[in-house]
Amino acid sequence: MSIIKEFREFAMRGNVVDLAVGVIIGALFGKIVSSLVSDIIMPPLGLLIGGVDFKQFALFLRNAQGGIPAVVMNYGAFIQNIFDFIIVAFAIFIAIKLMNKMRCKQEDTPAAPPKPSAEEKLLAEIRDLLKEQQTRQ
């Protein structure tokens, strides 16, 4: 089997395709959440605490000198990423909770009892014959 044929079979398996779709949707969902946090949530939050833009929060460890750039810790971006994480984690939590709820409803429906196997049928016949013999005696 050639390597190309093996790769094609690997790439076309359902799990790999599902994973690829999940990764793409996850990346796009991340962009949406980042936009939600940076464009919708953080501006009013900054306004509530005095018109502060969290992206601008930084700690200068060393100012620029000559050709050497400044050393800066941008903790405002870190705060914004924390908000991103919290919102994404909450959204995933809700999605999993809904999926589990739907799965439980599906599991609650009683399944039809399994049909007896050939061995079980044979044992039932033997039991019935033994009962008949005992009643005759």
Curated annotation (Swiss-Prot):
- Cytoplasmic topological domain ranges are 1-16, 95-137
Where it mainly occurs, coarsely classed, is: membrane
- The protein's assembly and partners: Homopentamer.
Keywords from UniProt, A to Z, are: Cell inner membrane, Cell membrane, Ion channel, Ion transport, Membrane, Transmembrane, Transmembrane helix, Transport
Give its localization: Cell inner membrane
- What does the record give as the function of this protein? Channel that opens in response to stretch forces in the membrane lipid bilayer. Forms a nonselective ion channel with a conductance of about 4 nanosiemens. May participate in the regulation of osmotic pressure changes within the cell.
User: Sorted alphabetically, which SUPFAM superfamilies does this protein's record hold?
Assistant: Gated mechanosensitive channel (SSF81330)
Pfam families for this protein: MscL
- Which one of the record's GO molecular function terms can you name? mechanosensitive monoatomic ion channel activity
Q: What is one GO cellular-component annotation here?
A: plasma membrane
Q: What is this protein identified as?
A: Large-conductance mechanosensitive channel
Membrane topology label: Multi-pass membrane protein
**Species of origin:** Pectobacterium carotovorum
Family per record: Belongs to the MscL family.
The residue ranges for the Periplasmic side of the membrane come to 46-74
Any stretches that span the bilayer, and where are they? 17-45, 75-94
State the Gene3D superfamilies in the record: Large-conductance mechanosensitive channel, MscL, domain 1 (1.10.1200.120)
